[in-house]
């Protein structure tokens, strides 16, 4: 019954899709829910990872297996979001300079690659969280999980801007700085730059780390 409700709302979403690419993604996801065929899910994931133009996007499905000790059984989750245009420009700059970061990283040359590319990255605003993503979620997501799809078709990497901002605001005034930061000068620098540097840290992880 739960999956029937998911399909019901996906069919509603299909009628108001942002573009034909997004409509095809939703249609293939519906087919997976109706058949349970993993081939349909793989085809959905490939269509989804190729849709880079839609401003509205989503995650929907049995995605992560963190809760299963064997890492075999995934839990259902959903996230509907829209792109943060201004912040996404920041991630695009980082991603487009992936080779520079690789060349200048402080590791032995034996571990460096001659040619690297940053993953497709953007900053999003979460509009709704469902399933295992509710009530709190990670500050970044990189999907799909299938290595062969990632190898042949790429992956999507996102930083969830409003979640990051909420976590930052919740951390302010918790007494940590007063207890552990050495000087007032450092406290002022943290108050001024901590949120931005935290966002850049996540961007570097999502754009270059993956």
Task: Identify the meaning behind each predicted range.
Residues 196-198:
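Alpha-helical scaffolds flanking conserved acidic
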Residues 1-190, 194:
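Contiguous, non-catalytic segments that form substrate-binding/exosite surfaces or channel walls
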Residues 19, 200-210:
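Active-site recognition of the HExxH zinc-binding catalytic motif
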């Amino acid at each position: 019954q739960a999956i029937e409700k998911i399909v019901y709302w996906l069919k509603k979403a299909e009628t108001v899709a942002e573009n034909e690419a997004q409509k095809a993604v939703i249609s293939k996801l519906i087919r997976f829910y109706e058949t349970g065929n993993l081939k349909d899910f793989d085809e959905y994931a490939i269509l989804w990872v190729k849709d880079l133009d839609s401003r509205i996007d989503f995650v929907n499905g049995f995605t992560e297996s963190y809760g299963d000790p064997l890492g075999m059984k995934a839990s259902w989750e959903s996230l509907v979001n829209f792109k943060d245009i201004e912040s996404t420009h920041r991630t695009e700059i980082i991603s487009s300079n992936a080779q520079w970061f690789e060349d200048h990283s402080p590791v032995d040359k034996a571990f460096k690659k001659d040619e690297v590319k940053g993953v497709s990255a953007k900053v999003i605003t979460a509009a709704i969280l469902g399933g295992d993503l509710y009530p709190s979620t990670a500050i970044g997501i990189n999907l799909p999980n299938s290595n062969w799809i990632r190898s042949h078709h790429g992956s999507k990497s996102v930083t969830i801007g409003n979640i990051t901002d909420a976590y930052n605001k919740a951390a302010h005034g918790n007494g940590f700085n007063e207890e552990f930061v050495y000087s007032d000068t450092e406290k002022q620098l943290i108050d001024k730059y901590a949120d931005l540097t935290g966002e850049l840290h996540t961007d570097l992880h999502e754009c270059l780390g993956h």
